[in-house]
Amino acid sequence: MTEETISQAVPPVRDWPAVDLPGSDFDPVLTELMREGPVTRISLPNGEGWAWLVTRHDDVRLVTNDPRFGREAVMDRQVTRLAPHFIPARGAVGFLDPPDHTRLRRSVAAAFTARGVERVRERSRGMLDELVDAMLRAGPPADLTEAVLSPFPIAVICELMGVPATDRHSMHTWTQLILSSSHGAEVSERAKNEMNAYFSDLIGLRSDSAGEDVTSLLGAAVGRDEITLSEAVGLAVLLQIGGEAVTNNSGQMFHLLLSRPELAERLRSEPEIRPRAIDELLRWIPHRNAVGLSRIALEDVEIKGVRIRAGDAVYVSYLAANRDPEVFPDPDRIDFERSPNPHVSFGFGPHYCPGGMLARLESELLVDAVLDRVPGLKLAVAPEDVPFKKGALIRGPEALPVTW
């Protein structure tokens, strides 16, 4: 991209540095970009050049659902990005466009339907009760992240994936190394290769499986020649890693509820509003730093009067879309009565997060178990003293010290 490829009226390129924001603070750079206009230009700490940034709710939905913007073309580019290393596997579902993307997602769709998610509800509730039991037996103080918020999502996603309980620790370790930007490219790539090898073996053993877990569904699809083993492994890795996002989201959720006890007390006294309240918290929580994966414009497209040329890189900000005042009145306020609430915390369009329904289930189970079974729960330190992750792409508390 060069200045000559675009018109004179384009916004200036804004540097967006990598910073570790305190708590659940909204990124001030993103706030400024939202004020500058619906379509701006950014340069992130890594990669090359600049990219467009789209922040309004309707435009974010347009870009993510429009075949004129593709992911596959990103593979051969060093698009400006937050992550210091870029190690996607060619053919991975996150970098495929329809129809290949649709074919691959179809292979595991059954596991993420309402029926598929309900299949693990009671087992998930049982595993969560065991974790809360253990925390209560040990007595206060406790680290809610270590005791509950970290092991629970790992157990649930491993259950859904068909990963044996004995391998959960390895999965968690690999995921943390892949998601962190502080260990360097070699460490992240080695962790990803080890997870790839693990799923290659596991899926390969299940080519004749009739099981309902994800690796069985993938193994059966490979056995029917609907997808390749490489495609199956790439999808399994993405789903496994994504499953742990609940740890960070729920960590921010409980940090917020315990920092503002009136919110937690309302959820205790009005349990019927919990599903709606969780949706509002999912909208409000800034779950990541900066932006995620880019897209490439496959032809010239005009958005809000700005011409995006074929070949230009484009990012959307789901965080910004969730604070669009045209869609969410008083967007910075947490409003448990907000309805409708068309947030895009799980994305939109063909790349919508397949685990969105599972994440909602886990969040509801966590709120029920923690608030109902530990009524005196409170932070053991001041809210501003809760340590948050540093050098990470996904935001969340490193630990959540609590007492009761």
Swiss-Prot record:
Single GO MF descriptor: heme binding
Entry keyword annotation includes Flavoprotein: no
Anything else known: The structural studies suggest catalysis likely occurs through proton relay via a 'proton wire' formed by water molecules in the active site.
SUPFAM superfamilies for the chain: Cytochrome P450
Reactions listed under catalytic activity: 2 flaviolin + 2 reduced [2Fe-2S]-[ferredoxin] + O2 + H(+) = 3,3'-biflaviolin + 2 oxidized [2Fe-2S]-[ferredoxin] + 2 H2O; 2 flaviolin + 2 reduced [2Fe-2S]-[ferredoxin] + O2 + H(+) = 3,8'-biflaviolin + 2 oxidized [2Fe-2S]-[ferredoxin] + 2 H2O
Protein name: Biflaviolin synthase CYP158A2
Record family assignment: Belongs to the cytochrome P450 family.
Entry annotated with the keyword Methyltransferase: no
Pfam families: p450
Residues the UniProt record annotates as site (Involved in determining product regiospecificity): 87
Chain positions recorded as heme binding sites: 353
Binding site for flaviolin 2: 288
GO BP field: pigment metabolic process
Class of enzymatic activity (EC top level): oxidoreductase
Positions with a binding annotation for flaviolin 1: 288, 293
Highest taxon of the lineage: Bacteria
Keywords (A to Z) from UniProt: Heme, Iron, Metal-binding, Monooxygenase, Oxidoreductase
Cofactor: heme
